[in-house]
Swiss-Prot record:
Organism from which the protein derives: Cupriavidus metallidurans (strain ATCC 43123 / DSM 2839 / NBRC 102507 / CH34) (Ralstonia metallidurans)
E.C. number: 4.6.1.17
This protein's record includes keyword RNA-binding: no
Catalytic function, reaction form: (8S)-3',8-cyclo-7,8-dihydroguanosine 5'-triphosphate = cyclic pyranopterin phosphate + diphosphate
Gene3D superfamilies in the record: Molybdopterin cofactor biosynthesis C (MoaC) domain
Gene Ontology biological-process annotations: Mo-molybdopterin cofactor biosynthetic process
Active site per database record: D128
Record-linked PANTHER family: MOLYBDOPTERIN COFACTOR SYNTHESIS PROTEIN A (PTHR22960)
Keywords: Lyase, Molybdenum cofactor biosynthesis
Residues involved in substrate binding: L75, C76, H77, M113, E114
HAMAP family attached to this UniProt entry: MoaC_B
Protein family per UniProt: Belongs to the MoaC family.
Protein name, UniProt field: Cyclic pyranopterin monophosphate synthase
């Protein structure tokens, strides 16, 4: 197993020096889910929630969050993202919505944290927009699905 990189020899937190790393194309894909009551799911699916287009607003929130990750996670590097894609998969039998966020950059450090942050904020936005009718929604299963590029190469969950 690799060493933790955000601590120096004295155990103090520090931001990792990526100055000597090569600029490479980097990609990360993350996902997470929110499960709700069937009636709430129908409101979201049909676009008839009182606050408006839940998934449209959640998509924009996810994109905004990916761009602000370094402001939220103390030791993350500010990254110039080159692409952010946000998709939703609706599973009616379980009243579950999956959010999938793909982030890309050409730089010296990965974009995993940006993808994960985008997923979390999308799910929180769905919760916020639907909580008036369903406070029991459950968010979960947030995870990195894959990452590509950089010194450590490619990684795919379950591979």
């Amino acid at each position: 197993m690799s060493q933790l990189t955000h601590f120096d020899n004295a155990g103090q937190a520090h931001m990792v020096d990526v100055g000597n790393k090569a600029n490479t194309h980097r990609v990360a894909v993350a996902t997470g889910t929110i499960t709700m009551l069937p009636a709430t799911f129908a409101l979201v699916r049909d676009g008839s929630a009182k606050k408006g287009d839940v998934l449209g607003i959640a998509r924009v929130a996810a994109i905004m969050a990916t761009k602000r990750t370094a402001d939220l996670i103390p030791l993350c590097h500010p990254i110039g993202l080159t692409k952010v894609a946000v998709d939703f998969a609706l599973d009616e039998p379980s009243s579950t919505i999956a959010c999938i966020v793909r982030t890309e950059t050409h730089g010296q450090t990965g974009v995993e944290m940006e993808a994960l942050t985008g997923v979390q904020v999308a799910l929180l936005t769905i919760y916020d927009m639907c909580k008036a009718v369903d406070r029991g929604m459950v968010m979960g299963n947030v995870k990195l699905l894959e990452k590509h590029g950089g010194k450590s190469g490619d990684w795919v969950a379950g591979a």
